[in-house]
């Protein structure tokens, strides 16, 4: 018997869960195909969510009513705002997670999602009909029909684990790889590449000398990821910090030839910003130590994740390395670290909707696109699932651009520039950082999510109430004003120019905060502290945001110049190099062309002039 759905999502990891939930929220009948329901929401590597750049993505997923932020709040056992001493634009919320609580909360959310059915099984082949996707076939022979398919296979595509001189096929420890899907992609015509990632050994926390390491508490009170989380109720823990030693490095150098990375056993690229401890020692030979963060994996689990010493050295070498690190001299290793290689698709095969250019109805999200990290996967999954549902229902696709959010920055980087190593999000990748802050993700995206039909009624009502409160607070702050002399009586030093300044303008001064303006106007104390914080940040950035708005307008002007179906050989003045690069990349807009390597401002000017001339000629011909 053949089942039928609007959308099928393959894989129950972070990308798959968001894709399936986003599709279902729009009303599309959605199937989530995964090996076992019990592995949904599993944290394959580090037990943490968020971080610099990554925390922005989590907040953006939340703004579109995605799952990750709320699940991370439910399972979070230590919350920290990274870069707190810096400006709000580059702060990154992060949470240490209890693996069991996180997975349980995700499974409950998936189970409770309307229009979503979980199917235990392994997708083995993509069904194609009439040049577009038509469904999937499972390894047990079952066929499932659909108008759209989202593939979110993580490290499972022809996954191969490496541990010292040993290697074996696996998607992750104790789970089989997905072999049939890789062959299916190749039959369709996709050229698959190989990437590598790794994980550290796991430790028995009861055998760690915690007195010998620095302890790191979380923020008090903890700040949630989701705007819908009133407060964190899960018990909070501390993490530990220790360092490798010269003895550690000597041991690694002595055995580096046994690492698959250096023996030639692994030839694929790994994540630049999350290198193995072997890589750190070889690449940074002048360092006498590297930080190791000891991260508990749960409230009732003694397992500790030593963040910073990912390795694929033989098991006995890993144990010897641990014994050279302060606090870990007598530690017991519950599972060795390892490296894993897996297939990926060149993300330049994708449209900004995350639909493949080669096959209509086929969408990809997560590590299959060359990214690394739970948060990057979740954001892609949401966009892919949303667009798959829109495609299945005959709706117009949605594209998030670089001025919309970090999810737009990431997707544009992937589909325009491609990757040579696993892609990780950082705040430095975004041109419009002042606009794209973690604290204003809902202000930027939730209204759009409501219009797209992926935001539930409860969040929509909360959002409208919050925006109304913020607008009222801003109007109130702008209606109150003081002269410099009046401000001086309250201890505030302003330029004695006689000009009255509103409470909102006063908040733009670096040395003036909400407490100072509330001391002048006590009625402001009635404003909700969360709204007051938003208002102060908006005031601090107001001048800069107005300047950035002009940059965004220019960016969107270039994005509006569409390059589809253009014959570059007919564009006079383009160099052969520019013409070749444009023909190969097939950018969708002049803005996207400008982000390609080797495309000069002069070439962009020629393209823009050509498009405008063509538009004038079409207008004249139709007159």
From Swiss-Prot:
Name of the protein described by the UniProt record: tRNA uridine 5-carboxymethylaminomethyl modification enzyme MnmG
Protein family (similarity comment): Belongs to the MnmG family.
Binding locations of FAD: 11-16
Record HAMAP family: MnmG_GidA (MF_00129)
Single GO BP term: tRNA wobble uridine modification
Organism listed in the record: Nitrobacter winogradskyi (strain ATCC 25391 / DSM 10237 / CIP 104748 / NCIMB 11846 / Nb-255)
Purpose: NAD-binding protein involved in the addition of a carboxymethylaminomethyl (cmnm) group at the wobble position (U34) of certain tRNAs, forming tRNA-cmnm(5)s(2)U34.
InterPro entries: FAD/NAD-bd_sf (IPR036188), GIDA_C_N (IPR049312), MnmG (IPR004416), MnmG-rel (IPR002218), MnmG-rel_CS (IPR020595), MnmG_C (IPR026904), MnmG_C_subdom (IPR047001), MnmG_C_subdom_sf (IPR044920)
Cofactor: FAD
Residues that hold NAD(+) according to the record: 270-284
């Amino acid at each position: 018997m053949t089942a039928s759905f609007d959308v099928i999502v393959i894989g129950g990891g972070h990308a798959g869960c968001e894709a399936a939930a986003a599709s279902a929220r729009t009303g599309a009948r959605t199937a989530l195909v995964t090996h076992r329901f019990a592995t949904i929401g599993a944290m394959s590597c580090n037990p943490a969510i968020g971080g610099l750049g990554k925390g922005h993505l989590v907040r953006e997923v939340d703004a579109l009513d995605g799952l990750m932020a709320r699940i991370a709040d439910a399972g979070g056992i230590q919350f920290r705002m990274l870069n707190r001493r810096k400006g709000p634009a580059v702060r990154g919320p992060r949470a240490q997670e209890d693996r069991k609580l996180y997975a349980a909360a995700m499974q409950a959310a998936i189970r409770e999602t309307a229009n979503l059915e979980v199917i235990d099984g392994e997708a083995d082949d993509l069904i194609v009909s009439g040049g577009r996707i038509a469904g999937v076939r499972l390894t047990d022979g079952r066929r499932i029909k659909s108008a759209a398919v989202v593939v979110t296979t993580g490290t499972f595509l022809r996954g191969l684990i490496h541990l010292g001189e040993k290697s074996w096929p696996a998607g992750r420890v104790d789970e089989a790889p997905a072999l049939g899907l890789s062959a299916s992609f190749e039959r369709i015509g996709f050229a698959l590449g190989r990437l590598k990632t790794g994980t550290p050994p796991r430790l028995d926390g009861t055998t760690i000398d915690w007195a010998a390491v620095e302890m790191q508490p979380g923020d008090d009170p903890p700040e949630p990821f989701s705007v819908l989380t009133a407060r964190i109720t899960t018990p909070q823990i501390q993490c530990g910090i220790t360092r490798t030693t010269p003895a550690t490095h000597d041991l690694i150098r002595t055995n580096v030839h046994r690492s698959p990375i250096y023996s030639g056993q692994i030839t694929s690229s790994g994540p630049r910003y999350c290198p193995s401890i072997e890589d750190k020692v070889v690449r940074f030979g002048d360092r006498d130590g590297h930080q190791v963060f000891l991260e508990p994996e749960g409230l009732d689990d003694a397992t500790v994740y030593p963040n910073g010493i990912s390795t694929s050295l033989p098991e006995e070498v890993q144990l010897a390395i641990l014994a050279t690190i302060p606090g870990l001299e007598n530690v017991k290793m519950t599972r060795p670290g390892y490296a894993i290689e897996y297939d990926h698709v060149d993300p330049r095969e994708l449209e900004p909707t995350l639909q493949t250019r080669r096959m209509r109805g086929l969408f990809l999200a997560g590590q299959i696109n060359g990214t690394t990290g739970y948060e990057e996967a979740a954001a892609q999954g949401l966009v892919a699932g949303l667009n798959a549902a829109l495609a299945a229902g005959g709706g117009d696709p949605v594209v998030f651009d670089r001025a919309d959010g970090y999810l737009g920055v990431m997707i544009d980087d992937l589909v325009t520039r491609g990757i040579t190593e696993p892609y990780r999000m950082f705040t430095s990748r975004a041109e419009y950082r002042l606009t794209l802050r973690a604290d204003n993700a809902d202000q930027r995206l939730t209204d759009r999510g409501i219009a797209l039909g992926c935001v539930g009624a409860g969040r929509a009502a909360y959002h409208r109430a919050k925006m109304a409160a913020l607008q009222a607070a801003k109007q109130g702050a702008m209606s109150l004003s003081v002269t410099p002399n009046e401000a001086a009586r309250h201890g505030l030093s302003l330029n004695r120019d006689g000009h009255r300044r509103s409470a909102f303008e006063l908040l733009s001064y670096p040395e003036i905060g909400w407490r100072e303006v509330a001391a002048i106007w006590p009625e402001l104390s009635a404003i909700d502290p969360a709204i007051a914080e938003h208002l102060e940040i908006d005031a601090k950035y107001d001048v800069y945001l107005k300047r950035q708005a002009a940059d965004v307008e220019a960016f969107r002007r270039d994005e509006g110049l569409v390059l589809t179906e253009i014959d570059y050989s007919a564009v006079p003045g383009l160099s052969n190099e520019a013409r070749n690069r444009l023909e190969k990349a097939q950018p969708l807009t002049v803005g996207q062309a400008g982000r390609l390597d080797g495309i000069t401002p002069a070439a962009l000017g020629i393209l823009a002039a050509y498009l405008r001339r063509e538009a004038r000629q079409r207008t004249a011909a139709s007159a």
